[in-house]
């Protein structure tokens, strides 16, 4: 694996009001890595992800993308280096699915920004990857939540950044679609990396190479095997977990009625 850092933080502190989400975090993401950000509801996964993407200014420290401070990069530079998938998509007006996905090529267009045949081919390929090619002529306003989220992922694929940043990429997806999404992210080209906020610990165990786990005033980071340990999960979620071995995989089950 290339040891080059795509994304890194130096003494990063993130807060909302008086609540400190993380303090003096040193962390790095290398090409080929699939990081999942875990933590209970309201712990600050989305806020941290937005800070890492350059949308929010940190309370302290720096976020670096390819060694440069993310706050000093232009919007076009950022769009080519990192792409962000939000939890939900807010469509202000009607558009075909294909047109929405072609919009991912905007960072590479010049002049009037007319899309080329190559852009359309890339968009259709991305729709095929997320199993939405049959919907290319449909109106995005008429899609289900899960379908719209997969179209947004196709847009991100068409944008083709080095760093894929996703806020709950399996949200609104049925079981089969969750596997499609996670398999796709795991098999991105090796020069790319993924940072995804997730809720499903068992999907994380199956697909992530690394985990960043947020707790109250504490952060655990490292390989998936090292972070996903019952005692660490209990500390982060205030809930005990039972681990069931299933061949080479582990299944994590919260234990009801125990605190």
Walk through the language-model features, giving the residues of each.
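Helix-to-loop junction immediately C-terminal to a conserved catalytic motif
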Residues: 53
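Conserved ABC ATPase "signature" region
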Residues: 102, 117-135
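The feature captures the beta-strand-to-loop junction immediately N-terminal to the Walker
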Residues: 38-40
């Amino acid at each position: 694996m290339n040891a080059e850092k795509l994304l890194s933080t130096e003494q990063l502190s993130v807060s909302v009001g008086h609540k400190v989400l993380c303090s003096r975090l040193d962390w790095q993401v290398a090409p080929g890595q699939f990081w999942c950000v875990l933590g209970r509801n309201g712990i600050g996964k989305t806020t941290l992800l937005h800070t890492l993407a350059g949308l929010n200014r940190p309370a302290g420290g720096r976020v670096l993308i390819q060694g440069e401070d993310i706050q000093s990069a232009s919007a076009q530079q950022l769009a080519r280096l990192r792409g962000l998938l939000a939890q939900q998509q807010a469509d202000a007006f009607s558009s075909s699915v294909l047109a929405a996905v072609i919009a991912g090529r905007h960072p590479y267009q010049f002049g009037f920004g007319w899309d080329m045949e190559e852009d359309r081919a890339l968009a259709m390929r991305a729709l095929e990857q997320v199993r939405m090619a049959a919907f290319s002529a449909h109106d995005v306003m008429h899609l289900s939540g899960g379908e719209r989220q997969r179209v947004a992922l196709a847009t991100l694929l068409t944008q083709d950044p080095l760093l894929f940043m996703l806020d709950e990429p399996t949200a609104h997806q049925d079981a089969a679609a969750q596997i499609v999404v996670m398999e796709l992210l795991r098999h991105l080209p090796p020069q790319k990396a993924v940072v995804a906020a997730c809720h499903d610990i068992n999907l994380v165990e199956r697909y992530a190479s690394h985990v960043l786990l947020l707790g109250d005033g504490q952060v655990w980071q490292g390989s998936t095997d090292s972070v996903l340990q019952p005692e660490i999960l209990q500390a982060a979620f205030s809930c005990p977990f039972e681990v069931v071995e299933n061949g080479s995989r582990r299944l994590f089950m919260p234990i009801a009625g125990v605190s």
